[in-house]
Amino acid sequence: MTMDTSPSHDAERGVTDVLLAEPRGFCAGVDRAIEIVERAIRKFGAPIYVRHEIVHNTFVVNDLKAKGAIFIEDLADVPPGATLVFSAHGVSRAVRDEAEARGFSVYDATCPLVTKVHVEVAKLHKEGYEFIMIGHKGHPEVEGTMGQLSEGIYLVEDVDDVAQLRVTRPDRLAVVTQTTLSTDDAAEILAAVKRRFPQVREPKQQDICYATQNRQDAVKVLAPQVDVVVVVGSPTSSNSNRLRELAERLGTPAYMVDSASDLRPEWFEGSARVGLTAGASAPELLVREVIERLRALGAVSVRKMAGVEETVRFPLPLGLGDKSMEGVA
């Protein structure tokens, strides 16, 4: 008896099933950052100025622009006396000092997990440590963390960078990482650092955030069960890009979309089962719109996979909490 290895009827006609990763989408840091901007607009009125995109998502940024947020990169573009919000990615000491010198009313939407890294850098620097930062050059979080010091912090993006690195204090050396990296890539680079600098001090807890870890773990479960993976996220979103790369590394074709309009029917030719996830800065509204588009392409079943339930919630800054907003329309 021979086994029939020809494509199934379902595979021939395209999408039939959609499997949703759990968890996916907004994390606590993104929720908090968006809420800070929205509350600032309600309390102080538009415009509210935000340094850099509050989170890396086109829909979120455009929605906040419509509500009265103005996104800037240079503090010189902020008028005197304005209210300024720092993005979730964090800022350097120089930016913080400039904002104070200009007299802005500042609300800090830096993710508390990024702030934790900044605090650790400041603490160990006082103890004479230099730092290796594992991250992506040019990412605002990396610029913010490296900008906590004027010197003594070195960026490595891959294992080759580690081999070429020269430090001043190999006996007083600590590692920090960008919070949105691939956990596998970060582990590989950290291992190379430890081989090169055996006395290096590792973070007390892994810097890569719980939400990044959970979403990557979910894709590791999702990808082998489907024919193609779709990641909802903007091109500038580091954690969304890592989800797409992870699925591809596991052998499953993967695509990243900013919205449902980016979907292409040809991606799903011969692919009955589609896995769907979203980066930590992508709202669930966009996921629902992608699901509807996949239904239009033939999907008849949409089901959630089992996954970690996230209950983390970060407090808002003083002045924007619930009590301070009483009576604000």
From Swiss-Prot:
Cofactors required: [4Fe-4S] cluster
| Pathway given in the UniProt record | Isoprenoid biosynthesis; dimethylallyl diphosphate biosynthesis; dimethylallyl diphosphate from (2E)-4-hydroxy-3-methylbutenyl diphosphate: step 1/1; Isoprenoid biosynthesis; isopentenyl diphosphate biosynthesis via DXP pathway; isopentenyl diphosphate from 1-deoxy-D-xylulose 5-phosphate: step 6/6
**InterPro entries in UniProt:** LytB/IspH (IPR003451)
What cystine linkages occur within this chain? none
The record's active-site residues are 141
Molecular function, one GO term: 4-hydroxy-3-methylbut-2-enyl diphosphate reductase activity
Q: Which residues bind dimethylallyl diphosphate?
A: 56, 89, 139, 237-239, 281
Keyword vocabulary terms for this entry: 4Fe-4S, Iron, Iron-sulfur, Isoprene biosynthesis, Metal-binding, Oxidoreductase
**Which Gene Ontology terms describe the biological processes this protein takes part in?**
dimethylallyl diphosphate biosynthetic process; isopentenyl diphosphate biosynthetic process, methylerythritol 4-phosphate pathway; terpenoid biosynthetic process
EC number(s) reported in the record: 1.17.7.4
Cofactor remark from the record: Binds 1 [4Fe-4S] cluster per subunit.
Q: What reaction does this catalyse? A: isopentenyl diphosphate + 2 oxidized [2Fe-2S]-[ferredoxin] + H2O = (2E)-4-hydroxy-3-methylbut-2-enyl diphosphate + 2 reduced [2Fe-2S]-[ferredoxin] + 2 H(+); dimethylallyl diphosphate + 2 oxidized [2Fe-2S]-[ferredoxin] + H2O = (2E)-4-hydroxy-3-methylbut-2-enyl diphosphate + 2 reduced [2Fe-2S]-[ferredoxin] + 2 H(+)
Binding-site positions, [4Fe-4S] cluster: 27, 111, 209
> Where, by residue number, does (2E)-4-hydroxy-3-methylbut-2-enyl diphosphate bind?
56, 89, 139, 179, 237-239, 281
Chain residues that bind isopentenyl diphosphate = 56, 89, 139, 237-239, 281
What's this protein's family per the entry? Belongs to the IspH family.
Q: What does this protein do?
A: Catalyzes the conversion of 1-hydroxy-2-methyl-2-(E)-butenyl 4-diphosphate (HMBPP) into a mixture of isopentenyl diphosphate (IPP) and dimethylallyl diphosphate (DMAPP). Acts in the terminal step of the DOXP/MEP pathway for isoprenoid precursor biosynthesis.
Per its record, how is this protein called by name? 4-hydroxy-3-methylbut-2-enyl diphosphate reductase
Q: To which species is this protein native?
A: Methylibium petroleiphilum (strain ATCC BAA-1232 / LMG 22953 / PM1)
